[in-house]
């Protein structure tokens, strides 16, 4: 499994450098950086998308990942979910929102589970592998911080911050 993940990451890095790829329009505007020299300034580095969670599909044919872009003026980040066909290296953007979608993983039935702040707090969502059929699975007060399903998807374990007692900040 480690070799598949390493291979997928190397493939993702190689495909990301392909200048012939059609650009996907994000829901936010990424800066159009022009390099005046070969020096990588902080502005140039911040304009790059950062790859987040990576997960290989149960059939080991598709790579699931998210890309985060930072907006300096708004002082916030945007994350969207993508899939890549490992056979041909073509990527497809599944989400395109002004919210963060992250922590994505494949479920045992071939769907994609992920966290999103779309409902006001971070909750668990699920969609089909093609991005259709978006469904909110949790509505936990204050949101969740992580999740994992049992192998048969009959049980869900989620993380949540819980305040135990008052401290000096209260």
Annotated model-derived regions:
Residues 60-64, 94, 110-113, 137, ...:
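Hydrophobic beta-strand positions that form the internal "hydrophobic ladder"
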Residues 24-50, 73-76, 84-100, 128-143:
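Multi-bladed beta-propeller domains
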Residues 2-8:
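Sec-dependent signal peptide recognition
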Residues 48, 67-80, 95-102, 115-125, ...:
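A flexible loop/linker signature enriched in serine peptidases of the S9 family
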Residues 18-20:
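Bacterial signal peptide processing site
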Residues 14-16:
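C-terminal motif of bacterial Sec signal peptides marking the signal peptidase cleavage site
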């Amino acid at each position: 499994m480690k070799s598949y993940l390493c291979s997928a990451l190397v493939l993702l890095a190689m495909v990301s450098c392909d200048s012939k790829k059609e650009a996907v329009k994000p829901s936010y505007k990424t800066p159009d950086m022009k390099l005046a020299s070969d020096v990588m300034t902080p502005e140039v580095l911040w304009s790059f998308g950062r790859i987040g969670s990576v997960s290989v599909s149960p059939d080991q044919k598709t790579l699931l990942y998210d890309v985060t872009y930072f907006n300096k003026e708004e002082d916030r980040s945007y994350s969207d979910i993508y899939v890549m066909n490992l056979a041909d290296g073509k990527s497809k953007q599944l989400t395109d929102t002004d919210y963060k979608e992250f922590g994505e993983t494949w479920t045992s039935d071939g769907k994609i589970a992920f966290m999103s702040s779309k409902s006001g707090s971070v909750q668990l969502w699920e969609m089909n592998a093609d991005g259709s059929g978006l469904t909110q699975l949790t509505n936990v007060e204050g949101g969740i911080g992580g999740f994992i399903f049992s192998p048969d998807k009959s049980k869900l374990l989620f993380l949540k911050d819980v305040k135990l007692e008052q401290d000096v900040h209260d």
